[in-house]
Each structure stands twice: as C-alpha cells, then as structure tokens.
Swiss-Prot record:
Subcellular location: Cytoplasm; Nucleus
Enzyme class (EC, first level): oxidoreductase
Keywords: Cytoplasm, NADP, Nucleus, Oxidoreductase
Protein name: Uncharacterized oxidoreductase C663.08c
One of the GO BP terms on file: cellular detoxification of aldehyde
Active site, renumbered: Y158 (proton donor), K162 (lowers pka of active site tyr)
GO molecular function: oxidoreductase activity
A Pfam family assignment: adh_short
Family of the protein in this entry: Belongs to the short-chain dehydrogenases/reductases (SDR) family.
Gene3D superfamilies found in the cross-reference section: NAD(P)-binding Rossmann-like Domain (3.40.50.720)
Keyword check for Plastid: no
GO cellular-component term (any): nucleus
Length: 253
C-alpha cells in the first residue's frame, strides 16, 4: 500500500456519526479508512459502503475489552504499519434520568464503554499512531461532559462518563506533548441519529423542551461529521489538549 496514503481508524464507524465520518473520509483521494464495529456482520450499511470503496476496511472491535482492542490493532497491522488519525467515536447513551434513581448497572455500563473503552483503544493503537505522520487522536465527547458549560438536563451517567473522558484526553495530551501528538475532544452537536431520536422520544412527555430543541437544532450525521472534519483537518500543535465544539469554537471543561 502506498505510503503517501493518509490512514484513519474510526472506532465506532458502523452507524450515525461514525458511518458519516467513514463515508466522507473514504471519498477523499489518498485515504485508507479502518472502521470498527462490535458486530461487523450486522453492520449492513457499513458493509454495503465498503463493497464500493476498496479503501475501507472493516475491523471487529468491542471497545469495552482491551483484548478486543489489541486484536483490532493486530488486524490493522496486517494492512498498514502506521495510523495517522485515531478517532474514538464509540459510546453508549441510555442515561437520561436524575442521579437519585440511576442504578449501578447504568453507571458501570457508561464508564466501561465511554471511559475505559477509549482508553483501551488508545493503549492498543498507541504504537501505530506513534509511527504515523499526523499523530492525531480525537475523542468524540459531549457538551454533557462540560462543567463550565453545563447543560441544564439530567444526563447523570452519560454526562459523568464524558467528563471523565475529557479528563483522560487532557492527561494523554500532556503525556504525549513531547512526542508531537495532537490530542483533542470534540462535541458533535445535537445530532439526528436513530439512538438520539429514541432517547428524545422517551423523555418528550416530561421534557417537551428537549423535543423542541432537537427538532429545531439537531444536525444530520453528515453535517456533524463534515464540520468536525474541518476542525480536525486544520489542527496544529498548539491545539493539543483542547475541547472543541463541532463548529470549531472551544468548549470549557
């Protein structure tokens, strides 16, 4: 494979925002895109896209398992020896209630996927990113994880997990700054995905303002992905450790 290609790995590239990232990137000239799915056989939209795009490689990955992350990295090394941009987009979001009645299993599942998951992917792919030319790591985060720009809505375990992810990003950016890495978090905006719509519908009766906000302001996955890529395409060393909004503005931690 040509060493002039720019190599991307998108963890969670089988639907929604992740799939839109895969599509836009793979339509660019000189790119190779690895897209992960927990169950590749069930990722029908990604499978269909890869059939017409030979530069897309589907990788099995369950981010909650370090073993799975290591196996995914090994699969990538069968094709390339470096990755330029690592984008961890995998996440769960099934917490839309107050802290007082959010059970342990909800906290644990969010932490396992949204915090340990990105850590597993980073640990497994660090050797590949270190060999890359761009050395960019992107974590898809959320405004829900910002305390400085607190959104007045009960998102308990989800918000806490994204706050922890932002801290993880900040620490990694510090640890890798002397190695030439650029590490950021980015909020994709309120995005019109199937999972987001389902959550909004579940809580529309008690929180009608959420339904209204979602209907008026939600982005399509394609728009969110395109805007975030504009941010990532223009990253410079001095941007290391920042928390971005999809439109390129900075979000306080």
């Amino acid at each position: 494979m040509s060493t002039t290609n720019k190599i991307y790995f998108i963890a969670g590239g089988n639907r929604g925002i992740g799939l839109s990232l895969v599509k836009e990137l793979s339509n660019r000239k000189g790119t190779v895109v690895f897209a992960s799915a927990r169950k590749p056989g069930a990722a029908t939209k990604l499978q269909e896209w890869s059939k017409s795009h030979s530069n897309v490689h589907i990788i099995k990955l369950d981010v909650s398992s370090l073993e799975s992350a290591n196996e995914a990295a090994q699969e990538v090394t069968k094709v390339v020896d470096a990755v330029d941009v690592l984008w961890v987009n995998s996440a769960v979001f099934h917490s839309f209630g107050p802290v007082v009645n959010t059970p342990d299993d909800v906290w644990n599942s969010h932490y396992k996927t949204n915090v340990l998951g990105p850590i597993h992917v980073y640990q497994a792919f660090y050797p590949l990113i270190k060999k890359g030319r761009s050395k960019i790591i992107v974590f898809t985060s959320s405004l829900a994880g910002s305390m400085g720009a607190f959104f007045p809505s009960s998102q308990s375990a989800y918000g806490q997990s994204k706050a922890a992810l932002n801290y993880t990003m900040k620490e990694i950016s510090f640890e890798l700054q002397d190695e030439g890495f650029i590490v950021i978090s980015i909020h994709p905006g309120a995005v019109r995905t199937d999972s987001a719509q389902e959550i909004v519908n579940q809580h529309a009766e008690k929180k009608p303002e959420i339904l209204d906000l979602f209907a008026k302001q939600a982005l399509t996955p394609e728009k969110s992905a395109s805007d975030m890529l504009k941010v990532v395409d223009n990253l410079k060393p001095e941007n290391n450790g920042l928390f971005y909004n999809y439109d390129g503005t900075i979000i306080p931690f």
